[in-house]
Amino acid sequence: MRLFLSLPVLVVVLSMVLEGPAPAQGAPDVSSALDKLKEFGNTLEDKAWEVINRIKQSEFPAKTRDWFSETFRKVKEKLKINS
């Protein structure tokens, strides 16, 4: 008797599993995926500009530029002396 009850239950469960997800649970809409991608791109752009502006405002680029200028000037002077 148990076998007669468990087989129909098993068939119903198996048919529900094989039927697949409901349309609301299916793949998300393409436009929503594109909106999420656009939002991610905008966020990434904002963060990149923030980092670039922070680097421009720091004194590291100025010190680096001065160091390269000074080093280049010294090399130029040494080449003039040796010539």
From Swiss-Prot:
A Gene Ontology biological process noted in the UniProt record is: negative regulation of triglyceride catabolic process
Extra information: Apolipoprotein C-I is present in acidic (APOC1A) and basic (APOC1B) forms in P.paniscus, P.abelii and P.troglodytes and perhaps also in baboons and macaques. The two genes for ApoC-I arose through a duplication process that occurred after the divergence of New World monkeys from the human lineage. In human, the acidic form has become a pseudogene sometime between the divergence of bonobos and chimpanzees from the human lineage and the appearance of the Denisovans. Pseudogenization resulted when the codon for the penultimate amino acid in the signal sequence was changed to a stop codon.
**Which residues does UniProt assign to the signal peptide?**
1-26
Q: Which family does it belong to?
A: Belongs to the apolipoprotein C1 family.
One cellular component (GO) term of this entry: endoplasmic reticulum
The record's section on InterPro entries has:
ApoC-1_sf, ApoC-I
Entry keywords, A to Z: Lipid transport, Lipoprotein, Secreted, Signal, Transport
Look up and give the organism this protein is from.
Answer: Macaca mulatta
Write the protein's name: Apolipoprotein C-I, basic form
UniProt key word Transmembrane helix: no
List where in the cell it is found.
Secreted
What GO molecular functions are on record for this protein?
fatty acid binding; phospholipase inhibitor activity
Describe the function of this protein.
Inhibitor of lipoprotein binding to the low density lipoprotein (LDL) receptor, LDL receptor-related protein, and very low density lipoprotein (VLDL) receptor. Associates with high density lipoproteins (HDL) and the triacylglycerol-rich lipoproteins in the plasma and makes up about 10% of the protein of the VLDL and 2% of that of HDL. Appears to interfere directly with fatty acid uptake and is also the major plasma inhibitor of cholesteryl ester transfer protein (CETP). Binds free fatty acids and reduces their intracellular esterification.
